[in-house]
């Protein structure tokens, strides 16, 4: 996808979309701030926000960090949204703790702030969170991997390809969920890397992209060339891991699992590159977020969480062509009908 950089001042991608008439534009405006503008997940998120903004007559401006982990650009984007008089902000935060003071500044200025995909830390630092149940997403692929391996899971050698050093909540939740599903004690539920299960070879970071996934996989293979299970933060990282394994002739005897459910990722499940993936729905997250900002602007009402949860759950499905007993899943044909990117 061709990128157009419109705001070099804070190293973020910014795009104002005038979907409202001049009289309406002054009434309701919103900001979408994502981690990057290149990951298909966030591209689809922006599409969902833009379509819903057009439908509701909301003026939308979109911003993104230069890379996953670029929190400085997100901080600058929040400042811009406050100065522009936006009614609300949808944010997929790169640094879920470091961004909190700036989020609070926006809330103090009267903006509704909704975390998309990645909960802030603490969760109530945002007015609401619209997200996949990332713990469940991880648990589903962990259960599937354990059942697929059977008794061999007890002697597995597991590599974790994580997101960034700051350990954002989405990273922690997916890791912890996988461990629970696979039968590994995650120890501190809010921390990555404190586990003592001998099956874990190690963790490395990917920045959520293919190049990072390849490098992280190469690093962990040097640590232990007998790795046979790989948990990846997302499908671009999984694709990179596969390339690293292929380069040493290991691609057919290592089980890779992931989270995202984008069309390229679902295709990779169908082709055997990825064993299974948990599919999430970014377009819905963003569309619901724009609806919430419009409602807040019109009535002052804030979103309420899904019953029994502390966030608005936008759904998750396990995609696998080799189903296992006790773990509900959909096949890749159905996954392709629901995918994005």
From Swiss-Prot:
Endpoints of the signal sequence: 1-20
Protein name: Fructose import binding protein FrcB
Family classification: Belongs to the bacterial solute-binding protein 2 family.
Pfam families: Peripla_BP_4
Subunit structure: The complex is composed of two ATP-binding proteins (FrcA), two transmembrane proteins (FrcC) and a solute-binding protein (FrcB).
Induction comment: Induced by fructose.
Subcellular location: Periplasm
Gene this chain is encoded by: frcB
Keyword Cell wall biogenesis/degradation: no
A single GO cellular-component term on record: periplasmic space
Organism (species): Rhizobium meliloti (Ensifer meliloti)
Function: Part of the high-affinity ABC transporter complex FrcBCA involved in fructose uptake. Is also a high-affinity transporter for ribose and mannose. Binds fructose, ribose and mannose.
UniProt main location, coarse: periplasm
Gene Ontology molecular function: carbohydrate binding
Keywords, sorted A to Z: Periplasm, Signal, Sugar transport, Transport
